[in-house]
């Protein structure tokens, strides 16, 4: 049995979409238990595998992260993180304030001993539909080569256990594919990744080929990763807007859109973040999943499923054994 703690109050459309996702999750997974934290006046479910705990406070999206974690002790997010810290839950899921959740993960759940810097990881879509694991996308703006090596080790485990890839290809994001390309960080990181025998290092990868499906794990520093992630998100939205404007531009185009509707739906689903769940803060002593703030019920359900798989696969235990315990 896997037990997941969930912040009922975080996200743009909470608690409605959270409750819908939780209800579907406990019905789909008979070996899943939920501890739900939130306002009892908005709790509407009744299920033997859902334990509800009332919280008198909520962390808002505009709250300063560290201050909110320290001052709002009875908030749904803080109480959720404490459940993981205390061993009551295997992992947690929230669609709330990203900075606050990262702070809760770092200061309440805590790092795995030996992990210097936790990394925020997402799974992004590719044109072949398989997707790739991308980290760090914003946990740490500054990174040393040793940090990128740990990201590669963590990402490799994540790709194996969460995505089911037997021997993941691990690549380093750079401005060229040649080993000598890049700045001091990427050059030194390249050598460290190349020398490590615990994963399948496939060399450098350029940003222009990320979506082609040539690799399984891409490693970079949080500053670069966050910019790349936002660029991909923005480009996808712009393409969607342009397609919509094109197909609605004339009667002929509207008819073409009807003919292509099935193909367009397939493309949209392939590129939809909801299919991949949330982002995960790797390197913590418990699974912490950040669902997108604008998640619908399907996306939040995917994030719960992601946390459950992490619990089933004992991913934190594996990271503790293989990456943790080393000198920082």
Curated annotation (Swiss-Prot):
A cellular-component GO term for this protein: cytoplasm
UniProt main location, coarse: cytoplasm
Pathway: Lipid metabolism; phospholipid metabolism
Record-level Gene Ontology MF annotations: phosphate:acyl-[acyl carrier protein] acyltransferase activity
Xref: SUPFAM superfamilies: Isocitrate/Isopropylmalate dehydrogenase-like
Cellular location(s): Cytoplasm
Origin: domain of life: Bacteria
GO biological process: fatty acid biosynthetic process; phospholipid biosynthetic process
InterPro entries xrefs: FA_synthesis, Phospholipid_synth_PlsX-like
Catalysed reactions listed for this entry: a fatty acyl-[ACP] + phosphate = an acyl phosphate + holo-[ACP]
Listed Pfam families: FA_synthesis
This enzyme's EC code(s): 2.3.1.274
Keywords attached to this entry: Cytoplasm, Lipid biosynthesis, Lipid metabolism, Phospholipid biosynthesis, Phospholipid metabolism, Transferase
Quaternary structure note: Homodimer. Probably interacts with PlsY.
Biological role stated in the UniProt entry: Catalyzes the reversible formation of acyl-phosphate (acyl-PO(4)) from acyl-[acyl-carrier-protein] (acyl-ACP). This enzyme utilizes acyl-ACP as fatty acyl donor, but not acyl-CoA.
Similarity annotation: Belongs to the PlsX family.
Protein name: Phosphate acyltransferase
Protein's organism: Staphylococcus haemolyticus (strain JCSC1435)
Lineage, broadest ranks: Bacteria, Bacillati, Bacillota, Bacilli, Bacillales
